[in-house]
Amino acid sequence: MSRAFRAAARGASLLTYYFDLAWRSCRRSKALTALVVLLMGCGAATCMVSFAVFRAAAADPIPWKSQQLFVPQIDNFGPAHNWKGEPPTLLSYTDAVALLQARQARRQVLIYGSKWTVLPGDAQHLPSSQEGDAVSHDFFAMFDAPFRYGGGWSASDDEQRAAVVVISSALNRKLFGGANSVGREIELDAHAYRIVGVLDDWNPSPRFFDVSSTWYPFSRPRQLYVPFSRAIDLHKAASTNFYCSTNSVDPYLPNWDSILHSECAWIAAWVELPRRADVERYRDWLHNYAAEQQRVGRFDWPPNVRLSGVGQWLQIMKVVPKSSALSLIVSVSFLLICLVNVVGLMLARFMRRAPEIGVRRALGASRGAIYRQFLTEAAAIGLAGGVLGLLLTALGMVGIGKVFEPEIARLATLDASLLLLTVLVAVTASLVAALYPTWRAAQVQPAWQLKSNG
Amino acid sequence: MQIRPILAALRRHKMATLLIVLQIALTLAAVSNALFIVKTRVLHLSRPSGTDEAHLVAIRNEWIGQPDARHIDAQMRADLATLRNLPGVRDAFASQAYPLQEGGGGLVRIKHRVEQTTKAQLALSYLADEHAIDTFGITLVAGRNFRADEIGSLGPYDKVAPAVIIITRDLAHKLFPDDVAVGQRVYLSDDGPSTIIGVVDRLQGSYAGSSTRSIDEDTVLVPARYASSDDGASYAGGTVYLVRAQPGQLAAVLRAAPAALVAQNRMRVINPEDGMVTLAQARTKAYATDRGVAIMMGAMCLLLLLATAGGIVGLSSFWVGQRRRSIGVRRALGATRGDILRYFQAENALIVGAGVVLGAALGIAANLSLMAHYELPRMPLWLLGVGALLLWLLGQLAVLGPARRAAAVPPVEATRSV
């Protein structure tokens, strides 16, 4: 037998011995052990459930491309009407169209949301109301929207205000039973539209691209997309965010033309800037555009523009609900309090066994052996807590919709990494909690314990 | 009871004492804040909407194909006549939102004068007609109801400037703290004054969330029908029909109403999933997360208290075990069982007292930092007092077992050694 093997075998048998000791001690103080396991399990589970929700809400919806997508903002409200110096989160029609026509980015997209009534061909079915976005043609390429059938429309369709539409797979199932419907017509708001594409199941979470206008980053998926220019021509009003000032009454807008020429903000814009140099160049262009507006007298304030990436934009839009951040804070503090309690309980547990430690030390066990023994015990308790935590986390994921917004709770998933993390958190927390009690246990003097009464 | 020997004994167990103090402090801070959040949530979800919720149903109706205002207005009148004539229906009216909804009401800014530069009074509005008060089941406490000829028609580009309005008592108090509101004129827009003709006792706005908490009871009834399929500056496209059923007839009305409307005219959309909700359903849905948070916080509190009690039991019994000899000595020197019992109780009271002081400070700090980041009011001090009392009682209860065991140590223990 090699030395290394013998050492390993001895280590393994010692570990079994430590586990055996831990098991005996747990049986001796059942209530205390149960309480520690319960605390660790509950602490870890609440943390994991809130973390799962937080992770779902704070996810990057388009990780492969989020570094290249940006939202431009132009302050057309001015210091008297903007929000603490920040430009509006949407663009006016004037600025949106100027940005689209300038073509300073690789791709540029305008978006606003509206509701459409879909009339079925036959009289048996009842009409339905569907939410959709009016977008310019670069939309599908910019956000890598996957198509099941067909594709997006072209730049010339945009220019000709073509009556074309891209529908979601859900709407395609509802209207055509999931068959390839490209080339067929549907009636929206009593106008005929030709279907050019059917999207695959596509619902980025959060739905970042129209978050500034729709307010619903986790629910109400868009069912159809029509050309922006066509929607404007049809006087299709925005069913989404529309505001003209952050602090005063909206101006009088007697007709569609006055809406288009107003300084009200209601159109979301995105630009695709692949390289870092492009971003700087675009920033300069935005600044110059605002400076030009000031020069011609439209703005009487210096340029106030922003260009934000996806992550930054989701932060500005406060996509992660405050409640989910709050519950993460609450549950982490809960775990910490549990930890403090566990330190106390472990201290009582370990110190009660001072006589046993004294005897083991007197029989030749080193300090290191005592450390190993008690940390093994802590890890074992942590493991038990972790298993309980797993059960509670799984249970929590079922009831999650009762505590968090159901739309977000739906996105929180129990995957392997979360399971592993639960056990890891419980074991690590138990080990940390056991550090001080173990240190105290290792300080027990063999002679003193043997002399005095145990 | 002597404090000095207790302190001397505790000095030998600095870390263990500190741990219990910390445990008590953290528990008090966490439990008081959690209970406070539960209290605000429960308060929030038990607010009455002021309406006859048990018999009300809201039907969201959308128009198809951008019909013009005249057509929509005529259709709405026809729909209302159909609904009011349905068996089991007490009354009905058309609005754009309903109570306990998550948003959808028009926000209005009310000014006393057009040229007013101070901040306008914010309020939430419902479009209404002369049937609104009876349908909601609210009571007029002053003034009169709308007349049929006062109900206007609003288009998407129109400004809201009705000649007459009815407001809630809460809003009346805010607008005219020392005056009678009925007969006064206010401005909902710069286009013209609106005369307050009536005051109703209570009617909650359409936002069930907490974002509009301060103006939830400040509601304006605007006498108009919104006749557009488009979303306007203030109102979402479509119509909400509010229908009040006769007692016991709600189920029948729920079945009959959408069918009757479709039979009247097919060119409409009533979403089969969420187009029709009773106010009871709306309340359950709107406050589901509030209830969940309250339950979760309550469970956490219970567990924390349990853990703290367990910690006290654990450390106290450990101490008792460690001090058996000194207890024996004290007993041998003439201390009674009661003396020993009281010693451990006093020790616990002292430790919990220190923890409570620290915990109160931590709890207030936590409340202040929560207030800075979240919409949470200041925590009342009595709640900390209740928490402190609870922990103190819990401590006494937890220490009782170990202390009794300590009191049971016989004096002869003093003479024993290994």
Question: What does each model-found stretch correspond to?
Answer:
Chain A
Residues 26, 350-353, 359-368, 444, ...:
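Short helix-to-coil transition segments within interhelical loops
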Residues 34, 340, 356-401, 421, ...:
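Transmembrane alpha-helical interface segments in multi-pass membrane proteins
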Residues 2-4, 8, 51-175, 179, ...:
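Structured, solvent-exposed hinge/loop segments at the ends of secondary-structure elements
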Residues 138-152, 163-317:
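Mid-to-C-terminal secondary-structure elements
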Residues 1-19, 24, 28, 32, ...:
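Membrane-helix entry/capping segments
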Residues 421-454:
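C-terminal membrane-exit region of the final transmembrane helix in multipass inner-membrane proteins
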Residues 51, 330-357, 370, 437:
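A hydrophobic alpha-helix feature that marks transmembrane segments and, especially
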Residues 28-62:
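Short, strongly hydrophobic transmembrane alpha-helices
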